[in-house]
Amino acid sequence: MSAPQAAIDTDHADRHGPRRAWAAVGVLALVGTLNYVDRFLPSVLAEPIKHDLELSDTAIGVINGFGFLIVYAVMGIAVARVADRGAFGAVVAGCLTLWGTMTMLGGAVQSGFQLALTRVGVAIGEAGSTPAAHAYVARNFVPQRRSAPLAVITIAIPLASTASLLGGGLLAQSLGWRTAFVIMGAVSVVLAPLVLLVVGVRQSLPAAPAVVDKTAGGWWNLLRKPSFLIVVAGTAFISAAGYSLTTFSPAFLMRTRGMSLGEVGVEYGLATGAIGVLGLLIVGRLADRLAERDPRWLLWIVVTLTLVLLPASVLAFVVEDRMLCVLFLALSYAIGTSYLAPSIAAIQRLVLPEQRATASAMFLFFNAVFGSVGPFVVGMLSDSLTDDLGAQALGRALLLLVAAMQLVGAICYWLASARYRRDIIEEAR
């Protein structure tokens, strides 16, 4: 490692101590869980919302997928610029308050258009929280130890899936989907003061070493790095599959396996939570260990994970047994959560400290923009097949698209690894 590179990687003289840093990671994981709970609610409650507001599968796909994620992607970069000044806690707390408030307002909507407007507000609020959390980790953990805390934060996704399916599903079944929105949103608003207390309002950033040319690690320069562009292509396909599963799996189980909303919440919610958390912890820890030998393992581990679990993405829509179907869906869903921690850790090594939140936001921008196409296409294909296949149309659409998108994503990650090491070395030039 050259001197300039060492200067970039050891910018932690003013970092939080291990106890506080891990406590903050725990709080950020809780925030992330609420982030995804509020994001997943319309998907979990898609069936009652669809019937109450008289929406089509295409409309559900646009509101929960394309429309939400486009706003999320664009605003993420804008808010991340504030976080890059060290205002990690302030950004997260402000975003938390906004999206919680907008989720509560979602319980009062009377049309699909009004629901879409509240989801725009949720998207704006959630946009800045994740990049700020990633930047906090990069600021307070050395490069070889970032995948584990990032994995803990990313555990929010399967935990949120379980919480939204269990909590949201059971609340909706007993009190109605509108009440579920109000209660879940209120929990987010209440948590904001804890973020300011543990994470802090802002944290000072190190001065960039004089020997380093800032343009070499600038976030704009990511667009000229082959490894970043190919990883972006890979995450586009993997996230498209993941968002499709998130949006339509509950509806698929209810339509084709005869499950009630409460049963989906308990069985599918617990399965995705348990498998997702286990997968993230294993992948995050393993990625850190392997990356010490070769940083390309941050990408290779995504390839390995996807190929090992890929058969589940086919079997989930073929097997008739209800429990096997739930198990395979949860395994397929785990691809779309476990790959994030090593991917983000890889991206963080391509930029300077003051550009990390923006780099993370750029990654999530492409993840969201291209990933949002998945639910939209699945919804349209399902609607087009309904006349011929009836209730089986949604399952057929998912069968045709999910595994194919995941496979293409794995191929992209493999191709990106060929250039990744060189792109890191360029930071020292």
UniProtKB/Swiss-Prot annotation:
Phenotype caused by lack of the gene: Deletion mutant is more sensitive to capreomycin, more resistant to rifampicin, and accumulates more ethidium bromide in the cell than the wild type.
InterPro entries in UniProt: MFS (IPR011701), MFS_dom (IPR020846), MFS_spinster-like (IPR044770), MFS_trans_sf (IPR036259)
Alphabetized UniProt keyword annotations: Cell inner membrane, Cell membrane, Membrane, Transmembrane, Transmembrane helix, Transport
Subcellular location(s) per record: Cell inner membrane
PROSITE patterns linked to this entry: MFS, NA_SOLUT_SYMP_2
Residue ranges of the TM segments: 21-41, 59-79, 86-106, 115-137, 150-170, 181-201, 228-248, 264-284, 299-319, 327-347, 361-381, 397-417
SUPFAM superfamilies in alphabetical order: MFS general substrate transporter
Presence of keyword Transmembrane helix: yes
Keyword Hydrolase in annotation: no
Membrane topology, record value: Multi-pass membrane protein
GO MF entries: transmembrane transporter activity
Superkingdom of origin: Bacteria
CC per GO annotation: plasma membrane
Protein function: Probably plays a role in bacterial growth and resistance to antibiotics.
Family in the record: Belongs to the major facilitator superfamily.
PANTHER family, alphabetized: PROTEIN SPINSTER, SPINSTER
Protein name: MFS-type efflux pump MSMEG_3705
